[in-house]
């Protein structure tokens, strides 16, 4: 392995007083991150040479988890994020999501409000999964297709961080970064394909800057896989499909959906085609997300219904041309929800 050619590692400043690092080594600083609106203004004054972004904490999930939960939580996120939008930061840093579905919903809420660049913090646990059981590769597959331009990984254990990066690196098509204790760099932690470093809240950028500059040994590069197959997610696990992937017959999203999904578990189709005919079907889909273990092809005659289904489905949906949609609508669904047109 060889050093990453794009960057020797850049740092995000999190304190206006660290602006002297810019004068010392401008190429080391990739941006400035403020934790509130007052700090954002200070960052703009002290660090005008780099983009200044704003940290946005994801709100807690409601105690009532009954469906429809996804759209309710998106509305909660929009209300929490709306005061930030008028300040027009260069980017937002989403963090603190309770699980992957909450993080995805927060991304949708932010892209509803703003076209600014998005960084998303992704906490990883053991065995390449998040605490809620979501495969980190499945999470990255979704985030990089719905508007997130940089994914920042965090972990309680250094080995969990390295393991997650090894899994993600060949398939990530966005910038990868880490937010970890500076001492991990001192111990030469392996950080494949990492280009960005964000200081922990209790640590100053100055110490991290010295380590990024002087201890590059763990920053190796894992070559990207060739895109001869598509990486998709069912909302929990990652799958690889090609354009000849078998898709089931249409499965109505009615009160028997869970039974039908169980019956199909032993059958051949690699993807389930779910039929959305009315708004109640969207609720049924959300109720049964935990039952879905394969890629999903969503079909609906109405683009409005299709969009509602895309908002609640936590994976990357396929579209096979059933009930032809306008090109402009498909383009929007692809950019907003990561829809994959077969």
Question: Residue locations for each model-derived region?
Answer:
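Domain-level signal for soluble alpha/beta catalytic cores
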Residues: 1-342
């Amino acid at each position: 392995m060889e050093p990453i050619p794009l960057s020797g590692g850049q740092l995000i400043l999190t304190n206006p007083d660290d602006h002297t690092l810019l004068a010392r080594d401008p190429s080391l600083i990739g941006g400035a991150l403020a934790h509130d609106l007052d700090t954002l203004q200070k960052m703009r004054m002290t660090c005008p040479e780099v983009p200044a972004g704003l940290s946005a904490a994801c709100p807690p999930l409601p105690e009532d988890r009954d469906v429809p939960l996804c759209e309710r939580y998106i509305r909660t996120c929009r209300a929490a994020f709306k005061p930030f939008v008028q300040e027009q930061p260069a980017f937002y840093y989403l963090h603190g999501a309770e699980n992957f579905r909450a993080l995805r919903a927060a991304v949708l809420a932010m892209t509803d409000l703003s076209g600014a660049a998005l960084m998303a913090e992704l906490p990883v646990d053991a065995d390449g999964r998040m605490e809620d059981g979501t495969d980190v590769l499945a999470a990255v597959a979704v985030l990089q297709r719905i508007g997130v331009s940089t994914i920042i990984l965090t972990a309680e254990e250094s080995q969990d961080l390295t393991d997650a990066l090894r899994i993600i690196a060949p398939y990530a098509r966005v910038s990868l970064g880490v937010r970890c204790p500076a001492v991990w760099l001192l111990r030469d932690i392996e950080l494949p394909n990492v280009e960005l470093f964000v200081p922990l809240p209790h640590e100053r950028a100055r110490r991290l800057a010295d380590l990024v500059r002087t201890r590059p040994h763990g920053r190796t590069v894992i070559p990207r896989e060739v895109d001869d197959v598509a990486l998709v997610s069912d909302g929990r696990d990652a799958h690889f499909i090609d354009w000849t992937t078998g898709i089931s017959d249409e499965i109505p999203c009615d009160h028997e959906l869970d039974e039908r999904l169980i019956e199909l578990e032993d059958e051949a189709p690699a993807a389930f085609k779910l039929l959305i005919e009315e708004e109640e079907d969207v609720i049924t889909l959300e109720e049964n997300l935990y039952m879905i273990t394969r890629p999903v092809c969503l079909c609906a005659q109405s683009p409005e219904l299709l969009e509602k289904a895309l908002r609640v489905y936590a994976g990357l949906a396929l579209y096979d041309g059933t009930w032809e949609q306008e090109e402009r609508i498909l383009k929007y669904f692809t950019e907003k929800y990561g829809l994959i047109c077969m």
